[in-house]
């Protein structure tokens, strides 16, 4: 993971997408799978969001979920989430390249003109 400077983010406002291994706004930052397990979550997943100055705080575009089984550990949960990420990110990138997505401000994005 790399944290981008606010100058860089401002220069490319609305042009940077990030995939994050949690159902944002839950568990921003690192160690998301461990945090989900320790919090006794039943559902976990991945989110794609526009990058803004606030870490993992930009508008969420789409999410995919997985169930957390009692036998899951960090490794098995990470594998489940990664499978969903491989579906989710290409879908959102396609929307972006089709110019269907737009970042309005630090907290608002649209898909096909509808606020997300």
Predicted features, each with a name:
Residues 116:
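Phosphate-binding loop/pocket of nucleotide- and phosphate-handling active sites
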